[in-house]
Amino acid sequence: MRFVLKRLALFVVALFGLSVVVFAALRILPGDVASVMAGVNSPPERVTQLREQLGLNRPLIAQYFDWMSALARGDFGTSILTGRSVTSLVGARASITFPLIILGLLIALAIGLPLGCAAVLARSATVRAVFHVLAIVGGAVPALWGGLLLILLFGRGVGLLDVFPSQGFPLDGWGAPGSAISALVLPAVSVGIIVGASLMRYTRAVLGDLASSGYIDMARSCGMTRTQAVLRVGLRLATPQLVSVIGLTFASMVTGVMVIENLFALPGIGNGLVTDVGNRDLIAVQSELFLLAAFFLTVGLVVDLL
């Protein structure tokens, strides 16, 4: 119980610190936000009105506490450019990003865990070297390059095999589940290959250490083969570490798929955040960054408590 309370206290402190960092970082950016949002040829009266609307004419400490009090009420603000609430914007984008990273993570697990186990169990030095090269190449391939290659191979209208949509998301979203899933296949594979290579390296490292430990020797002395001992005993012992890595990987993928979302023209969280930053939509950006930070910290807290 004491550990749980300590972790919760650290979570609150970290969340407060991140809110200060997000708020301060957006205020020290060069250029006047109100002038940029109003437009180049806007009259000074419009800029002044926009500064009052955004609360930029108030002291910084007052602006921060206004923002914090609004967050405490569940009010994440309204985008100046679109007029939509930040909650609805993030919700719409999350309905694309989270299925993408879940599908990508499933592909990564299907690649990383079996290959990591196989790399540990391989007796031939040549086979182990092949697995080592696969892990390095898979992790070194840039997401942009890998995505472009998949589009050229499988993209509908431009690829050799003409199988999956190469860009965009259905206008009716998940109203057409088949089309929505089809649009996520190539992006998810792009993500899955890169993340899968990292999971393969980590699985190989963890199981490799356990394979030479006394636990495996004890299991083998009970009549298990080396393969049985590694897969039954080793994997069970490695599960807490693997769960921690998978959880943190899932959290980091929310913004990590930003390049993939831009490449495949998916209106997800990362793509939307880039657009909002480019448009200097201050209210939307600061709330989106805070929500992303809170999500990452929450996943880290859950992983620690498991």
Segments from the language model and where they lie:
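Alpha-helical transmembrane segments of integral membrane proteins
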Residues: 1-2, 12, 90, 94-127, ...
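Hydrophobic alpha-helical transmembrane segments of membrane transport/permease proteins
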Residues: 14-65, 154, 158-180
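Juxtamembrane/transmembrane-helix interface segments of polytopic membrane transporters
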Residues: 18, 22-26, 147, 151-159, ...
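Membrane-water interface at transmembrane helix exits
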Residues: 22, 26, 30, 34, ...
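Transmembrane helix irregularities
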Residues: 29, 138-141, 254
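An internal, D/E-rich "acidic patch" concept
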Residues: 57-113
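Membrane-water interface segments at transmembrane-helix boundaries in multipass membrane proteins
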Residues: 133-198
